[in-house]
From Swiss-Prot:
GO terms for biological process: secondary metabolite biosynthetic process. Belongs to the flavin-dependent halogenase family. It comes from the Eukaryota. The keyword Oxidoreductase applies. This is Flavin-dependent halogenase radH. It comes from Floropilus chiversii.
Amino acid sequence: MSIPKSCEVLVAGGGPAGSYAASALAREGVDVVLLEADKHPRYHIGESMLPSIRPLLRFIDLEETFEKHGFQKKLGAAFKLTAKREGYTDFVAAHGPNGYSWNVVRSESDELLFKHAAKSGALTFQGVKVDSLEFEPYDSDFPSGGKVANPGRPVAARWSAKDGRSGTISFQYLVDATGRAGITSTKYLKNRKFNEGLKNLAIWGYYKGARPWAEGTPRENQPYFEGMRDGAGWCWTIPLHNGTVSVGAVLRSDLFFAKKKSLGEDVTNAMIMAECMKLCPTIKELLEPAELVSDIKQATDYSYSASAYAGPYFRIVGDAGCFIDPFFSSGHHLAMAGALAAAVSIRASMKGDCSEYEASNWHARKVDEGYTLFLLVVMAALKQIRMQEEPVLSDIDDDGFDRAFQFLKPVIQGSGSAEIVKRFTKKEVSEAIDFAVLALDNMAGAGEHANETNGSNGTGETNGDAKTLENITVEDEKVLSGIRILAKVAPSADMKDLEGTAIDGFMPRLEHGHLGLNRV
Protein backbone atom coordinates (compact mmCIF):
# COMPACT_ATOMS: atom_id res chain seq x y z
CA MET A 1 0.00 0.00 0.00
CA SER A 2 1.32 3.46 -0.91
CA ILE A 3 1.38 6.36 1.49
CA PRO A 4 -1.53 8.64 0.54
CA LYS A 5 -1.04 12.23 -0.54
CA SER A 6 -3.33 13.57 2.18
CA CYS A 7 -5.24 12.65 5.34
CA GLU A 8 -7.23 14.24 8.12
CA VAL A 9 -4.74 13.45 10.89
CA LEU A 10 -1.08 12.55 10.45
CA VAL A 11 0.48 10.79 13.43
CA ALA A 12 4.29 10.94 13.28
CA GLY A 13 5.77 8.15 15.37
CA GLY A 14 4.49 4.66 16.15
CA GLY A 15 5.55 4.19 19.75
CA PRO A 16 2.99 3.90 22.57
CA ALA A 17 1.85 7.54 22.32
CA GLY A 18 1.51 7.63 18.54
CA SER A 19 -0.11 4.22 18.21
CA TYR A 20 -2.58 5.04 20.97
CA ALA A 21 -3.55 8.39 19.45
CA ALA A 22 -3.98 6.76 16.03
CA SER A 23 -6.22 4.04 17.51
CA ALA A 24 -8.38 6.47 19.48
CA LEU A 25 -8.93 8.74 16.48
CA ALA A 26 -9.45 5.98 13.91
CA ARG A 27 -12.11 4.40 16.12
CA GLU A 28 -14.00 7.69 15.79
CA GLY A 29 -14.01 7.36 12.01
CA VAL A 30 -11.19 9.84 11.46
CA ASP A 31 -8.93 9.38 8.41
CA VAL A 32 -5.59 8.69 10.16
CA VAL A 33 -2.16 7.95 8.70
CA LEU A 34 0.51 6.67 11.12
CA LEU A 35 4.19 6.82 10.06
CA GLU A 36 6.82 4.98 12.14
CA ALA A 37 10.50 5.54 11.37
CA ASP A 38 11.61 2.12 12.61
CA LYS A 39 10.18 -1.34 12.00
CA HIS A 40 8.37 -3.38 14.63
CA PRO A 41 9.32 -5.35 16.59
CA ARG A 42 12.11 -3.06 17.75
CA TYR A 43 13.94 -2.86 21.06
CA HIS A 44 13.13 -0.17 23.61
CA ILE A 45 13.77 0.28 27.31
CA GLY A 46 10.94 1.15 29.71
CA GLU A 47 9.34 -2.12 30.74
CA SER A 48 7.27 -1.37 33.84
CA MET A 49 3.69 -0.05 33.84
CA LEU A 50 1.33 1.58 36.35
CA PRO A 51 -2.20 0.25 36.95
CA SER A 52 -3.62 3.44 35.44
CA ILE A 53 -2.63 1.93 32.09
CA ARG A 54 -5.47 -0.59 32.23
CA PRO A 55 -8.42 1.78 31.74
CA LEU A 56 -6.50 3.53 28.98
CA LEU A 57 -6.04 0.22 27.16
CA ARG A 58 -9.65 -0.69 27.91
CA PHE A 59 -10.86 2.50 26.25
CA ILE A 60 -9.43 1.41 22.89
CA ASP A 61 -10.37 -2.28 23.43
CA LEU A 62 -6.78 -3.46 23.90
CA GLU A 63 -6.78 -4.48 27.57
CA GLU A 64 -7.81 -8.08 26.87
CA THR A 65 -5.04 -8.44 24.27
CA PHE A 66 -2.44 -7.41 26.84
CA GLU A 67 -4.04 -9.74 29.39
CA LYS A 68 -3.84 -12.73 27.08
CA HIS A 69 -0.34 -12.04 25.81
CA GLY A 70 1.30 -13.45 28.92
CA PHE A 71 3.27 -10.46 30.15
CA GLN A 72 4.63 -10.68 33.70
CA LYS A 73 1.96 -9.49 36.12
CA LYS A 74 2.96 -6.52 38.24
CA LEU A 75 1.02 -6.82 41.49
CA GLY A 76 2.91 -3.95 43.09
CA ALA A 77 6.43 -2.61 43.47
CA ALA A 78 8.96 -2.03 46.24
CA PHE A 79 11.03 1.12 46.68
CA LYS A 80 13.98 1.36 49.05
CA LEU A 81 15.00 5.00 49.19
CA THR A 82 17.40 4.80 52.15
CA ALA A 83 19.31 2.13 54.02
CA LYS A 84 16.54 1.81 56.62
CA ARG A 85 13.73 -0.07 54.86
CA GLU A 86 11.61 -0.31 51.75
CA GLY A 87 8.09 0.86 51.03
CA TYR A 88 5.69 -1.24 48.97
CA THR A 89 2.77 -0.24 46.76
CA ASP A 90 0.19 -3.02 46.50
CA PHE A 91 -1.87 -2.56 43.33
CA VAL A 92 -4.16 -5.51 44.07
CA ALA A 93 -4.94 -4.34 47.60
CA ALA A 94 -5.82 -0.92 46.21
CA HIS A 95 -7.90 -2.03 43.21
CA GLY A 96 -8.93 -5.65 43.70
CA PRO A 97 -7.70 -8.91 42.13
CA ASN A 98 -7.58 -7.44 38.63
CA GLY A 99 -5.89 -4.25 39.73
CA TYR A 100 -2.42 -5.31 38.62
CA SER A 101 -0.47 -3.97 35.67
CA TRP A 102 2.37 -5.64 33.74
CA ASN A 103 6.08 -5.68 33.16
CA VAL A 104 6.39 -5.80 29.37
CA VAL A 105 8.97 -6.68 26.77
CA ARG A 106 8.74 -3.46 24.81
CA SER A 107 9.36 -4.98 21.41
CA GLU A 108 6.20 -7.03 21.98
CA SER A 109 3.96 -4.48 23.71
CA ASP A 110 4.81 -1.68 21.28
CA GLU A 111 4.03 -3.96 18.34
CA LEU A 112 0.67 -4.86 19.88
CA LEU A 113 -0.18 -1.17 20.10
CA PHE A 114 1.01 -0.45 16.56
CA LYS A 115 -0.94 -3.33 15.03
CA HIS A 116 -4.01 -2.28 16.99
CA ALA A 117 -3.91 1.13 15.30
CA ALA A 118 -4.30 -0.64 11.96
CA LYS A 119 -7.10 -2.84 13.32
CA SER A 120 -8.82 0.33 14.52
CA GLY A 121 -8.79 1.75 11.00
CA ALA A 122 -5.60 3.80 10.73
CA LEU A 123 -3.33 3.42 7.71
CA THR A 124 0.02 2.41 9.22
CA PHE A 125 3.46 2.45 7.61
CA GLN A 126 6.78 1.31 9.07
CA GLY A 127 10.30 2.32 8.11
CA VAL A 128 9.03 5.78 7.15
CA LYS A 129 10.47 8.85 8.87
CA VAL A 130 9.00 12.34 8.96
CA ASP A 131 11.96 14.56 8.05
CA SER A 132 10.42 18.02 7.98
CA LEU A 133 7.17 19.93 8.33
CA GLU A 134 5.66 22.68 6.22
CA PHE A 135 3.87 25.53 8.01
CA GLU A 136 1.50 28.23 6.86
CA PRO A 137 0.90 31.47 8.78
CA TYR A 138 -1.99 31.21 11.20
CA ASP A 139 -3.04 34.48 12.78
CA SER A 140 -6.64 33.63 13.61
CA ASP A 141 -6.98 34.56 17.29
CA PHE A 142 -4.37 32.06 18.46
CA PRO A 143 -1.99 33.80 20.87
CA SER A 144 1.17 32.10 22.04
CA GLY A 145 1.64 31.75 25.78
CA GLY A 146 0.71 29.46 28.61
CA LYS A 147 1.44 26.03 27.18
CA VAL A 148 0.56 26.70 23.53
CA ALA A 149 2.65 28.21 20.74
CA ASN A 150 1.80 29.65 17.34
CA PRO A 151 4.58 28.96 14.84
CA GLY A 152 1.91 28.77 12.16
CA ARG A 153 -0.27 25.87 11.10
CA PRO A 154 1.52 22.68 9.94
CA VAL A 155 -0.06 21.56 6.67
CA ALA A 156 2.31 18.96 5.22
CA ALA A 157 5.18 16.65 6.11
CA ARG A 158 8.10 15.49 4.01
CA TRP A 159 8.89 11.81 4.61
CA SER A 160 11.59 9.33 3.58
CA ALA A 161 11.43 5.53 3.68
CA LYS A 162 14.17 3.01 4.39
CA ASP A 163 13.63 1.53 0.91
CA GLY A 164 14.62 4.83 -0.71
CA ARG A 165 11.17 6.25 -1.42
CA SER A 166 10.27 9.78 -0.35
CA GLY A 167 7.28 12.04 -0.62
CA THR A 168 5.00 14.61 0.94
CA ILE A 169 1.70 14.13 2.75
CA SER A 170 -0.70 16.95 3.57
CA PHE A 171 -2.99 16.87 6.59
CA GLN A 172 -5.50 18.86 8.60
CA TYR A 173 -4.09 17.95 12.03
CA LEU A 174 -0.71 16.67 13.23
CA VAL A 175 0.07 14.51 16.25
CA ASP A 176 3.82 14.66 16.94
CA ALA A 177 4.80 11.41 18.66
CA THR A 178 8.38 11.35 17.38
CA GLY A 179 9.88 10.40 20.74
CA ARG A 180 13.00 12.08 22.06
CA ALA A 181 13.76 13.42 18.57
CA GLY A 182 10.67 15.61 19.10
CA ILE A 183 10.68 17.21 15.65
CA THR A 184 8.22 19.99 16.48
CA SER A 185 9.82 20.98 19.79
CA THR A 186 13.45 20.67 18.76
CA LYS A 187 13.40 21.74 15.10
CA TYR A 188 10.66 24.35 14.94
CA LEU A 189 9.63 25.60 18.38
CA LYS A 190 13.13 25.12 19.82
CA ASN A 191 11.58 25.08 23.28
CA ARG A 192 12.91 21.93 24.95
CA LYS A 193 14.33 22.60 28.39
CA PHE A 194 16.28 20.19 30.55
CA ASN A 195 15.82 19.87 34.29
CA GLU A 196 19.23 20.56 35.75
CA GLY A 197 18.47 18.51 38.87
CA LEU A 198 17.64 15.42 36.81
CA LYS A 199 20.50 15.16 34.31
CA ASN A 200 21.13 11.46 34.68
CA LEU A 201 22.66 8.59 32.77
CA ALA A 202 21.35 5.03 32.69
CA ILE A 203 23.10 1.70 32.17
CA TRP A 204 21.29 -1.62 32.06
CA GLY A 205 21.31 -5.23 30.94
CA TYR A 206 19.39 -8.50 31.19
CA TYR A 207 20.09 -11.39 33.54
CA LYS A 208 18.89 -14.95 33.95
CA GLY A 209 18.79 -16.95 37.15
CA ALA A 210 18.35 -14.08 39.60
CA ARG A 211 16.65 -14.70 42.92
CA PRO A 212 13.12 -13.30 43.05
CA TRP A 213 12.61 -10.51 45.55
CA ALA A 214 10.48 -11.46 48.61
CA GLU A 215 10.61 -15.15 47.70
CA GLY A 216 7.95 -17.21 49.44
CA THR A 217 5.69 -14.23 50.18
CA PRO A 218 2.69 -12.77 48.30
CA ARG A 219 5.06 -10.08 47.02
CA GLU A 220 7.43 -12.54 45.39
CA ASN A 221 9.10 -11.49 42.14
CA GLN A 222 7.72 -7.96 42.02
CA PRO A 223 9.86 -5.07 40.70
CA TYR A 224 12.36 -3.70 43.18
CA PHE A 225 13.88 -0.20 43.09
CA GLU A 226 16.73 0.67 45.45
CA GLY A 227 18.58 3.90 46.12
CA MET A 228 22.38 3.70 46.04
CA ARG A 229 23.90 4.05 49.48
CA ASP A 230 26.14 6.93 48.36
CA GLY A 231 23.15 8.90 47.05
CA ALA A 232 24.42 8.89 43.47
CA GLY A 233 21.27 7.35 42.02
CA TRP A 234 19.15 4.21 42.05
CA CYS A 235 18.98 0.70 40.63
CA TRP A 236 16.12 -1.45 39.38
CA THR A 237 15.20 -5.09 38.89
CA ILE A 238 12.14 -5.81 36.73
CA PRO A 239 11.25 -9.48 36.05
CA LEU A 240 9.98 -10.20 32.52
CA HIS A 241 7.85 -13.01 31.11
CA ASN A 242 10.65 -14.24 28.83
CA GLY A 243 12.62 -15.51 31.83
CA THR A 244 15.01 -12.59 32.08
CA VAL A 245 15.27 -9.78 34.61
CA SER A 246 15.88 -6.23 33.48
CA VAL A 247 18.53 -4.71 35.77
CA GLY A 248 19.86 -1.20 35.54
CA ALA A 249 21.21 1.85 37.29
CA VAL A 250 20.33 5.52 36.92
CA LEU A 251 22.77 8.03 38.35
CA ARG A 252 23.76 11.64 37.96
CA SER A 253 25.83 12.01 34.83
CA ASP A 254 28.66 13.82 36.63
CA LEU A 255 28.88 11.03 39.21
CA PHE A 256 28.76 8.38 36.47
CA PHE A 257 31.81 9.86 34.78
CA ALA A 258 33.56 10.26 38.14
CA LYS A 259 33.01 6.55 38.83
CA LYS A 260 34.23 5.72 35.34
CA LYS A 261 37.40 7.76 35.81
CA SER A 262 38.12 6.19 39.18
CA LEU A 263 38.04 2.68 37.67
CA GLY A 264 40.85 3.37 35.19
CA GLU A 265 41.35 3.52 31.43
CA ASP A 266 40.04 0.05 30.60
CA VAL A 267 36.76 0.44 32.45
CA THR A 268 33.65 -1.12 30.92
CA ASN A 269 29.98 -0.47 31.57
CA ALA A 270 29.81 -3.92 33.16
CA MET A 271 32.41 -2.80 35.71
CA ILE A 272 30.48 0.39 36.44
CA MET A 273 27.30 -1.66 36.81
CA ALA A 274 29.03 -3.91 39.33
CA GLU A 275 30.11 -0.86 41.33
CA CYS A 276 26.54 0.45 41.34
CA MET A 277 25.21 -2.91 42.51
CA LYS A 278 27.60 -2.84 45.48
CA LEU A 279 25.75 0.27 46.62
CA CYS A 280 22.37 -1.50 46.37
CA PRO A 281 22.87 -4.47 48.71
CA THR A 282 19.42 -6.01 48.28
CA ILE A 283 19.69 -6.07 44.48
CA LYS A 284 23.30 -7.25 44.70
CA GLU A 285 22.12 -10.24 46.74
CA LEU A 286 19.32 -11.02 44.24
CA LEU A 287 21.87 -11.09 41.41
CA GLU A 288 24.45 -13.34 43.10
CA PRO A 289 23.34 -16.52 41.28
CA ALA A 290 22.42 -14.68 38.05
CA GLU A 291 24.16 -14.63 34.69
CA LEU A 292 24.33 -11.58 32.44
CA VAL A 293 22.87 -12.58 29.06
CA SER A 294 23.15 -9.27 27.19
CA ASP A 295 25.48 -6.37 26.64
CA ILE A 296 25.33 -3.54 29.15
CA LYS A 297 23.57 -0.70 27.37
CA GLN A 298 23.95 3.00 28.08
CA ALA A 299 21.79 6.05 27.39
CA THR A 300 21.40 9.58 28.61
CA ASP A 301 18.40 9.83 30.89
CA TYR A 302 17.90 13.57 31.04
CA SER A 303 14.51 14.78 32.18
CA TYR A 304 13.09 17.57 30.04
CA SER A 305 9.92 19.49 29.34
CA ALA A 306 8.81 22.19 26.90
CA SER A 307 7.18 25.59 27.06
CA ALA A 308 4.36 24.40 24.74
CA TYR A 309 2.72 21.08 23.89
CA ALA A 310 0.25 22.26 21.25
CA GLY A 311 -0.47 24.92 18.67
CA PRO A 312 -2.73 25.55 15.69
CA TYR A 313 -3.84 22.11 14.50
CA PHE A 314 -0.94 20.21 16.11
CA ARG A 315 -0.52 18.27 19.36
CA ILE A 316 2.70 16.98 20.94
CA VAL A 317 2.54 13.74 22.93
CA GLY A 318 4.80 11.35 24.84
CA ASP A 319 8.57 11.78 24.85
CA ALA A 320 8.27 14.22 21.93
CA GLY A 321 7.19 16.78 24.51
CA CYS A 322 8.52 15.77 27.90
CA PHE A 323 10.40 12.99 29.65
CA ILE A 324 10.92 12.36 33.33
CA ASP A 325 13.19 10.07 35.33
CA PRO A 326 11.62 6.57 35.16
CA PHE A 327 11.80 5.85 38.91
CA PHE A 328 8.01 5.46 39.21
CA SER A 329 7.37 3.92 35.77
CA SER A 330 5.38 6.93 34.57
CA GLY A 331 6.37 6.74 30.90
CA HIS A 332 3.53 4.63 29.53
CA HIS A 333 0.92 6.48 31.56
CA LEU A 334 2.09 9.91 30.40
CA ALA A 335 2.37 8.72 26.79
CA MET A 336 -1.10 7.21 26.58
CA ALA A 337 -2.88 9.81 28.70
CA GLY A 338 -1.32 12.52 26.52
CA ALA A 339 -2.32 10.63 23.38
CA LEU A 340 -5.91 10.39 24.59
CA ALA A 341 -5.86 14.12 25.37
CA ALA A 342 -4.69 14.76 21.81
CA ALA A 343 -7.50 12.63 20.38
CA VAL A 344 -10.12 14.27 22.61
CA SER A 345 -8.99 17.79 21.72
CA ILE A 346 -8.72 17.10 17.98
CA ARG A 347 -12.22 15.66 17.87
CA ALA A 348 -13.49 18.62 19.90
CA SER A 349 -11.96 21.00 17.36
CA MET A 350 -13.26 19.01 14.40
CA LYS A 351 -16.81 18.91 15.73
CA GLY A 352 -16.96 22.50 16.94
CA ASP A 353 -17.19 21.69 20.65
CA CYS A 354 -14.86 24.64 21.09
CA SER A 355 -12.38 26.75 19.14
CA GLU A 356 -9.09 25.28 17.96
CA TYR A 357 -7.31 27.51 20.43
CA GLU A 358 -9.42 26.21 23.31
CA ALA A 359 -8.88 22.60 22.20
CA SER A 360 -5.11 23.08 21.87
CA ASN A 361 -4.92 24.77 25.24
CA TRP A 362 -6.88 21.95 26.90
CA HIS A 363 -4.48 19.35 25.50
CA ALA A 364 -1.38 21.32 26.44
CA ARG A 365 -2.58 21.92 29.98
CA LYS A 366 -3.46 18.24 30.39
CA VAL A 367 0.01 17.12 29.28
CA ASP A 368 1.73 19.69 31.47
CA GLU A 369 -0.26 18.79 34.58
CA GLY A 370 0.60 15.10 34.19
CA TYR A 371 4.28 15.90 33.78
CA THR A 372 4.29 18.24 36.78
CA LEU A 373 2.61 15.66 39.01
CA PHE A 374 5.23 13.02 38.34
CA LEU A 375 8.00 15.59 38.56
CA LEU A 376 6.88 16.27 42.12
CA VAL A 377 6.86 12.67 43.27
CA VAL A 378 10.06 11.72 41.42
CA MET A 379 11.95 14.69 42.84
CA ALA A 380 10.64 13.83 46.31
CA ALA A 381 12.03 10.32 46.06
CA LEU A 382 15.31 11.28 44.40
CA LYS A 383 15.99 14.02 46.90
CA GLN A 384 15.55 11.48 49.69
CA ILE A 385 17.93 9.09 47.90
CA ARG A 386 20.55 11.80 47.49
CA MET A 387 20.26 13.07 51.05
CA GLN A 388 20.04 9.52 52.53
CA GLU A 389 20.01 10.10 56.30
CA GLU A 390 18.36 13.53 56.25
CA PRO A 391 14.58 13.13 56.71
CA VAL A 392 13.35 14.71 53.47
CA LEU A 393 9.99 12.96 53.45
CA SER A 394 9.52 12.34 57.17
CA ASP A 395 11.37 10.99 60.18
CA ILE A 396 13.47 8.14 58.90
CA ASP A 397 12.28 5.49 61.27
CA ASP A 398 10.07 2.55 60.39
CA ASP A 399 6.77 4.21 61.21
CA GLY A 400 7.85 7.56 59.84
CA PHE A 401 8.88 6.14 56.51
CA ASP A 402 5.58 4.33 56.16
CA ARG A 403 3.76 7.60 56.78
CA ALA A 404 5.91 9.48 54.31
CA PHE A 405 5.57 6.81 51.65
CA GLN A 406 1.81 7.34 51.71
CA PHE A 407 2.50 10.59 49.86
CA LEU A 408 3.79 8.63 46.88
CA LYS A 409 1.45 5.65 46.95
CA PRO A 410 -1.72 7.19 45.46
CA VAL A 411 0.21 8.38 42.42
CA ILE A 412 2.03 5.08 41.87
CA GLN A 413 -1.04 2.95 42.55
CA GLY A 414 -3.42 5.07 40.53
CA SER A 415 -5.69 5.63 43.51
CA GLY A 416 -6.78 9.02 42.23
CA SER A 417 -6.94 12.47 43.73
CA ALA A 418 -9.49 11.67 46.46
CA GLU A 419 -6.95 9.53 48.32
CA ILE A 420 -4.39 12.33 48.24
CA VAL A 421 -6.84 14.90 49.58
CA LYS A 422 -7.84 12.56 52.42
CA ARG A 423 -4.33 11.65 53.50
CA PHE A 424 -2.13 14.71 53.65
CA THR A 425 -1.65 17.76 55.78
CA LYS A 426 0.06 20.91 54.61
CA LYS A 427 3.15 19.96 56.62
CA GLU A 428 3.41 16.52 55.04
CA VAL A 429 3.19 17.90 51.54
CA SER A 430 5.68 20.62 52.41
CA GLU A 431 8.20 18.04 53.57
CA ALA A 432 7.80 16.13 50.33
CA ILE A 433 7.87 18.94 47.78
CA ASP A 434 9.75 21.86 49.32
CA PHE A 435 12.47 21.43 46.70
CA ALA A 436 10.03 21.52 43.74
CA VAL A 437 9.23 25.24 43.77
CA LEU A 438 10.12 25.94 40.17
CA ALA A 439 8.17 23.01 38.86
CA LEU A 440 5.20 24.33 40.77
CA ASP A 441 5.55 27.85 39.39
CA ASN A 442 3.88 26.97 36.12
CA MET A 443 0.82 25.50 37.82
CA ALA A 444 0.64 28.48 40.19
CA GLY A 445 0.42 30.80 37.20
CA ALA A 446 3.99 31.98 36.63
CA GLY A 447 4.17 30.06 33.38
CA GLU A 448 7.65 28.68 33.85
CA HIS A 449 9.17 25.28 34.66
CA ALA A 450 12.10 24.59 36.96
CA ASN A 451 14.87 24.89 34.42
CA GLU A 452 13.36 27.90 32.67
CA THR A 453 14.16 30.14 35.65
CA ASN A 454 16.80 27.95 37.22
CA GLY A 455 19.71 27.72 34.87
CA SER A 456 18.23 27.24 31.40
CA ASN A 457 18.94 29.72 28.64
CA GLY A 458 15.86 28.58 26.73
CA THR A 459 17.78 26.70 24.04
CA GLY A 460 17.91 23.31 25.71
CA GLU A 461 21.26 24.14 27.35
CA THR A 462 21.82 25.02 31.00
CA ASN A 463 24.22 27.39 32.67
CA GLY A 464 26.38 26.81 35.69
CA ASP A 465 24.23 28.70 38.16
CA ALA A 466 21.40 26.20 38.43
CA LYS A 467 20.55 25.16 41.96
CA THR A 468 21.03 21.55 42.87
CA LEU A 469 18.07 19.38 43.70
CA GLU A 470 19.15 19.35 47.33
CA ASN A 471 19.02 23.13 47.72
CA ILE A 472 15.68 24.15 46.20
CA THR A 473 13.12 25.41 48.71
CA VAL A 474 9.56 26.69 48.46
CA GLU A 475 7.25 29.16 50.17
CA ASP A 476 4.00 28.13 51.84
CA GLU A 477 1.81 29.39 49.00
CA LYS A 478 3.70 27.19 46.57
CA VAL A 479 3.15 24.20 48.83
CA LEU A 480 -0.56 24.89 48.69
CA SER A 481 -0.39 25.00 44.90
CA GLY A 482 1.35 21.64 45.08
CA ILE A 483 -1.56 20.22 47.05
CA ARG A 484 -3.90 21.53 44.37
CA ILE A 485 -1.86 19.81 41.65
CA LEU A 486 -1.92 16.50 43.47
CA ALA A 487 -5.61 16.79 44.21
CA LYS A 488 -6.39 17.62 40.60
CA VAL A 489 -4.36 15.35 38.35
CA ALA A 490 -3.40 12.16 40.19
CA PRO A 491 -3.87 9.22 37.81
CA SER A 492 -6.75 6.88 38.52
CA ALA A 493 -7.01 3.17 37.84
CA ASP A 494 -10.55 3.70 36.53
CA MET A 495 -10.07 7.03 34.64
CA LYS A 496 -12.53 8.81 36.95
CA ASP A 497 -10.08 11.65 37.49
CA LEU A 498 -9.58 12.18 33.76
CA GLU A 499 -13.32 12.19 33.11
CA GLY A 500 -14.10 14.40 36.08
CA THR A 501 -11.41 17.06 35.70
CA ALA A 502 -12.27 20.41 34.11
CA ILE A 503 -9.57 22.57 32.52
CA ASP A 504 -10.48 26.14 31.60
CA GLY A 505 -14.16 25.28 31.55
CA PHE A 506 -13.97 22.05 29.52
CA MET A 507 -14.28 18.41 30.55
CA PRO A 508 -13.47 15.41 28.34
CA ARG A 509 -16.30 13.41 26.83
CA LEU A 510 -15.00 9.83 26.76
CA GLU A 511 -17.73 8.17 24.73
CA HIS A 512 -16.99 6.06 21.66
CA GLY A 513 -18.40 7.82 18.65
CA HIS A 514 -18.74 11.07 20.59
CA LEU A 515 -15.17 11.78 21.73
CA GLY A 516 -14.63 15.45 22.48
CA LEU A 517 -15.01 18.19 25.09
CA ASN A 518 -18.03 19.41 27.02
CA ARG A 519 -18.26 23.01 28.14
CA VAL A 520 -19.04 23.27 31.87
